[in-house]
Amino acid sequence: RWHDVDTDDFVARLNQFYADTRFHEFYQQHQEFYEEGLRTYETNVMQYFHQEWYARFYGTEPTEKFRVVIGFTNGGGNHGPHRQLSDLPKEVFAIVGYYVNPQTGKAYEKGLDYASTLIHEFNHSFVNPLLNDDSNIGMLKEIGQNLLKLSPIGMQRQNYAQWNIVVNESIVRAAVIIYMLDNGFSVEQQLKEIFDNVCRDFRWM
């Protein structure tokens, strides 16, 4: 989302901020809080995330490195930045929001609600490269354009206004449902996933 940014200047300023605010001391003072958040996420959310399924389902290893970061100061929002270092696999980050139930004071109580984001995003590591193949573009372009015509406003609102993005998102969302079938999710959980997609204008799910 950043354009024409001097990254060297940004990193220099970030390092200066780290020093000026004595951030390392702040982290040490709150280390138990962060570690408890990680333990809770591991227990409540990661139990639903079975990374070995992906290579088995797609028949290939991922071409990207997938990393999960808890955004303790981000509220409930999720972000998906990436970086490409020379001669190294592309790294894709799922920066997941930190949410605490205000009634109970506990974090990530409904683990599946948060795991679905990981399950979805990791599928993109396998699905997105498919449209780098010209033969796949030839087969899927017309389909993607037709799907886009079925729900142009809904797709536009979600920044999915290009046929290739609609194809990627559709395949990923279908793969999530198959993931749930293969990993013993309840019928209610599967139906909720389908219903959520229909509500997001992916009515062909």
Question: What kind of region is each of these model predictions?
Answer:
Residues 30-92:
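Auxiliary, metal-adjacent structural segments of Zn-dependent hydrolase domains
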Residues 112-133:
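Active-site recognition of the HExxH zinc-binding catalytic motif
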Residues 1-44, 61:
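Non-catalytic architectural context of zinc metalloproteases
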Residues 58, 70-74, 99-100, 123, ...:
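Short, flexible loop/turn elements at secondary-structure junctions
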Residues 129-201:
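Post-HExxH zinc-binding segment in Zn-dependent metallohydrolases
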Residues 35-44, 104-108, 113, 157-163:
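Second-shell loop/turn segments in exported
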Residues 10, 37, 50-53, 114, ...:
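Stable alpha-helical elements in mature extracytoplasmic
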Residues 79-112:
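Active-site scaffold of zinc-dependent metalloenzymes
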